[in-house]
Amino acid sequence: MPVKVFTALVVVDVQNDFLENGALGVPKASEVIDPINRMAQTFERVIVTQDWHCADHVSFAANHEGKAPGDKIQLPYGEQILWPTHCVEGTSGADLATGLRLPMSRVIAILKGNDK
């Protein structure tokens, strides 16, 4: 069977909680939105990844008494840095960034970080 080859733009974690005023904001993050919108129109597929955590995710400092973002803890798989609560499934912070205008009929979404 022949393999179908297509072009794809990969958009990684462009979510509200990672924009400047989000729970885990990145300076100037919103500056990528317009270029992504323009480029997305020229690709056959757009693959988007989203951080997608349950509220009691093990990496959230709020779920560990006396711990703060940036602290480290030991887990069975090794050292884990603790983060502010962010990209909780079903919240606006986990949504793709406001302003992204993607051709949804050509989008493939990958949710990650959804294990505990």
For the regions a protein language model found, what residue spans apply to each?
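Active-site acidic carboxylates
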Residues: 1-115
